[in-house]
């Protein structure tokens, strides 16, 4: 891996705990980044005592600090953009208010704030203001503090949509955003003419999510379990989208079949 490199490993409930121990042995606990949850089904699974509708993506980095600096934010989707509005016709555009407190106690961030209506405010128990007082005064002077529709609320910071450069990735990946197994099987059928060519296909959107987070336009991506070549397809899609020059290395232990008894090692990676 590169110094800012990262590895994503997909696994289900059967081996996730064994894999976690192995990953900690190889990479070390300090290099753990996250365990992402992929919602692989959109309908309830009723054959088990508790329905299985997700898989895991274990994420480790050579340097979590460097990966955090290098990783990309995700574009705001329409649902996220709807959280911003402009009820007061602010010339700076749509905005939303966000909390002005943080967890814990910080002595220099426990000052008293006087609201326009004369009410005084201190941080709630166990919390502190998000900024020191002089920084708060700058926001106040710029009319970046929101006191609620009637002016009787607690101080909140106004954040404009134009200032948001994307969403920090989080660990919950719902099927609406990254696809599900049925979608993956349909993609397989579109290429190979059958949905049974591979047992555990991944939707292209899932791999695209990983690549959007973890890669830059000139990076090399290695997939040890290439399967149907979904990683290659997702990478080429992303290159087409942003003009990047990402390259891939795919590794697969191709199983012998009636059509390929010699276990061909090389095949075309492009499909129309």
Task: Describe the residue ranges of each PLM region.
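Beta-strand segments within the central parallel beta-sheet cores of soluble alpha/beta enzyme folds
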Residues: 34-37, 226, 247-250
């Amino acid at each position: 891996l590169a110094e800012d490199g990262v590895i994503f490993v997909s696994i289900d409930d059967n081996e996730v705990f064994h894999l976690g121990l192995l990953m900690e042995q190889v990479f070390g606990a300090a290099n753990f980044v996250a365990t992402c949850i992929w919602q692989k089904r959109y309908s309830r699974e009723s054959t088990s005592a508790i329905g299985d509708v997700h898989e895991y993506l274990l994420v480790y980095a050579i340097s979590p600090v460097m990966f955090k600096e290098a990783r990309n934010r995700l574009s705001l989707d329409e649902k996220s953009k709807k959280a911003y509005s402009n009820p007061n016709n602010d010339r700076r555009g749509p905005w939303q208010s966000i909390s002005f407190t943080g967890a814990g106690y910080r002595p220099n961030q426990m000052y008293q704030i006087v609201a326009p209506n004369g009410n005084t405010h201190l941080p709630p128990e166990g919390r502190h203001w998000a900024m020191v007082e002089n920084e708060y005064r700058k926001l106040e002077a710029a009319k970046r503090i929101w006191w609620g529709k009637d002016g009787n609320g607690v101080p909140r910071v106004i954040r404009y949509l134009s200032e948001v450069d994307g969403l920090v990735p989080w660990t919950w990946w719902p099927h609406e955003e990254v696809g599900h197994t049925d979608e993956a099987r349909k993609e397989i059928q579109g290429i190979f003419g059958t949905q049974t060519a591979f047992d555990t296909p991944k939707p292209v959107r899932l791999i695209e999510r990983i690549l959007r987070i973890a890669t830059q336009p000139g990076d090399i991506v290695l997939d040890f379990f290439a399967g149907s070549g979904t990683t290659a397809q997702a990478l080429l899609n992303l290159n087409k989208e942003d003009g990047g020059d990402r390259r891939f290395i795919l590794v697969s232990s191709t199983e012998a079949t009636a059509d390929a008894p010699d276990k061909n090692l090389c095949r075309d990676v492009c499909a129309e």
